[in-house]
Amino acid sequence: MGIKFLEVIKPFCAVLPEIQKPERKIQFREKVLWTAITLFIFLVCCQIPLFGIMSSDSADPFYWMRVILASNRGTLMELGISPIVTSGLIMQLLAGAKIIEVGDTPKDRALFNGAQKLFGMIITIGQAIVYVMTGMYGDPAEMGAGICLLIIIQLFVAGLIVLLLDELLQKGYGLGSGISLFIATNICETIVWKAFSPTTINTGRGTEFEGAVIALFHLLATRTDKVRALREAFYRQNLPNLMNLIATVFVFAVVIYFQGFRVDLPIKSARYRGQYSSYPIKLFYTSNIPIILQSALVSNLYVISQMLSVRFSGNFLVNLLGQWADVSGGGPARSYPVGGLCYYLSPPESMGAIFEDPVHVVVYIIFMLGSCAFFSKTWIEVSGSSAKDVAKQLKEQQMVMRGHRDTSMVHELNRYIPTAAAFGGLCIGALSVLADFLGAIGSGTGILLAVTIIYQYFEIFVKEQAEVGGMGALFF
């Protein structure tokens, strides 16, 4: 019997800032406007540097996670969406393990969302303190207590802004969710930048452009040996190359292809004779949720490992969790796990690394597939998309499955939904691993998130278009 945890935190949820639900139907044009405003605020916060930081030039321990967590180093968006996703991860695991009870009522759902927001704010403060005290912005002793507190307040306010922007879209004022919007924007921005960046970097081969496409034309124009120039443009190390770009496009195409896989269950109206329809169960039943939660798990493990490494360097247990080394070739300095649990849960750094340490590869594949399948399976129980919830929705709409009674509908849906959730999560994990091994820009997880989010927005657009009757009616 789980404890009634939601009732305990109810008084705290009442004092949290909240976006009110719209009192009227929001038109598509208004939704586009609110979505654009939300995105603009996020992008502005990504460019405003934190006041009071002494230095952010040290190796970045979260370089590999920033694209996925929509964060930008040394700015108000330092934490990105990490606190929201982490609070969602914790609440989901607690509900999935039946440690807390979440009923089917709207009241319980609202309390669950309130608890998630409360945890998000607590995690924001916790992460801000960890970032400051581990010396990411300079030695705390040199900065002084006042400046340290000021940085923590800035990060907390920025985290609160992200929470409210996400809630604004989720309540129906905009399209999709803030988390999805910020992730997709960050990943697409990274891909475009890595492809067309005009920034020059001094390497052992001379001065080169960071952007893969610009580097191709630059190498062909400046090198006398054109074949060697082409080889460099396609396979150069530590900088974006054309093979990375091709891999990115390939993964985009594969994920879009798999988005169309689904099983249509025949349903009919219990009220009107001859009214038939179908209920689609997609292969990616839980969409990108498994990969977002898996990223949150890994990023928090990185935070803990980095924090302990700074404070207790050389300790056996700390090294068992993760050993870190600085990498500076071809871009900003960043920390990368070279040992311990964090190393085995991170993707191989290059194709060569796959053959150098096959144990790392095997552990990484098992972790990705297992965690994505697990998160996908548990997510349906707390998100209102389990077989029992779907059967209840169909019953409310007075729809029944053809050839089945009301009582057997849950049993029939149970044959498909949990399997689709687990197998879909497994496929998401497998595609992410494939993208990592192919060297796709923005990491396999990032590409997968970008494609699934863009596809979600495409589906929203098509649905809105069908409701208002044509493209012209959407905007005019």
UniProtKB/Swiss-Prot annotation:
The chain crosses the membrane at residues 34-53, 77-96, 118-138, 145-165, 173-193, 241-261, 289-309, 355-375, 421-441, 446-462. GO terms for biological process: post-translational protein targeting to membrane, translocation; SRP-dependent cotranslational protein targeting to membrane, translocation. Component of SEC61 channel-forming translocon complex that mediates transport of signal peptide-containing precursor polypeptides across the endoplasmic reticulum (ER). Forms a ribosome receptor and a gated pore in the ER membrane, both functions required for cotranslational translocation of nascent polypeptides. GO terms for cellular component: Sec61 translocon complex. This is Protein transport protein Sec61 subunit alpha isoform 2. It comes from the Eukaryota. Residues 54-76, 139-144, 194-240, 310-354, 442-445 are lumenal. It comes from Homo sapiens (Human). Belongs to the SecY/SEC61-alpha family. Gene3D superfamilies: SecY subunit domain (1.10.3370.10). GO terms for molecular function: protein transmembrane transporter activity; ribosome binding; signal sequence binding. It is a multi-pass membrane protein. Keywords: Endoplasmic reticulum, Membrane, Protein transport, Translocation, Transmembrane, Transmembrane helix, Transport. It is found in: Endoplasmic reticulum membrane. Its main location: endoplasmic reticulum. Residues 1-33, 97-117, 166-172, 262-288, 376-420, 463-476 are cytoplasmic. The SEC61 channel-forming translocon complex consists of channel-forming core components SEC61A1, SEC61B and SEC61G and different auxiliary components such as SEC62 and SEC63.
